[in-house]
Amino acid sequence: MIKRVNKLVLGISLLFLVISITAGCDMGKEEEIKKSFEKTLSMYPIKNLEDLYDKEGYRDDQFDKNDKGTWIIGSEMATQNKGEALKVKGMVLYMNRNTRSAKGFYYVNAVKKDEDGRPQDNKIEYPVKMVDNKIIPTKDIKDGNIKKEIENFKFFAQYGTFKDLSKYKDGDISYNPEVPSYSAKYQLTNDDYNVKQLRKRYDIPTNKAPKLLLKGSGDLKGSSVGYKDIEFTFVEKKGENTFFTDSLHLEPSEDK
């Protein structure tokens, strides 16, 4: 009887030890993920995008020694009401630190599925450039609404803020060392500053508070290969979605 009790106690102790170690590993990985994103997100808000020409980013052996790199900044809003196409609007800008010039495109898309259930892309791109911190179309645009959307467009990095990532706690952590890929997901409230800013700028068809997802690939300590995105997920289910994505990272320039 005593042996059985001792075995039971030992088994319970080992179980608690495993749980403690697992929890500790998750907490450690969560802090690593936050630290990995913090290097870039701590720069937000960047009200004048031209400040990025003087901002250093992560560099590795993929960069030529004379290449200052190109910042790639993107923001995108996607909404899909039940039974409708996924409507996407966003912008990507390539900011070359060597030439101190920026070009990119504004885009709209309506993703539908064909009879076989395969998504059909209907993306339309409108080339743009940035001069004196203003986004300007480089070709004539007949659609007045699109022209106005481009003129009024602001990247999330210009108004979002992540000065204190430590306030986000107990996230849903995922890490795959084989890829490698990683993510941390947090439930937000509608009182969150960034959520208020998104609702102010976009017609978000739900009152549900979003989840914040920090997701990336590549070496957690830093890499020019891979990606780091942040996503605010308001609705995520079959045939109905609402989410906002943002990214900012430095890559080797095509023209050194």
UniProtKB/Swiss-Prot annotation:
Q: Where are the N-palmitoyl cysteine lipid anchors?
A: C25
Q: Where is the lipid attached (S-diacylglycerol cysteine)?
A: C25
Location of the protein in the cell = Cell membrane
Q: Which PROSITE patterns did the record assign?
A: PROKAR_LIPOPROTEIN
Against Gene3D superfamilies, the record matches this protein to:
2.50.20.40
Keywords, sorted A to Z:
Cell membrane, Lipoprotein, Membrane, Palmitate, Signal
Q: Which Gene Ontology CC terms are recorded?
A: plasma membrane
Quote the InterPro entries the UniProt record gives.
Csa, Csa_sf
Report the membrane topology from the UniProt record. Lipid-anchor
The residues the entry assigns to the signal sequence are 1-24
Q: According to its UniProt record, which protein family does this protein belong to?
A: Belongs to the staphylococcal tandem lipoprotein family.
Question: Which NCBIfam families does this one have?
Answer: SA_tandem_lipo
Protein name as annotated: Uncharacterized lipoprotein in plc 3'region
- Organism equals Staphylococcus aureus
User: What are the leading ranks of the lineage?
Assistant: Bacteria, Bacillati, Bacillota, Bacilli, Bacillales
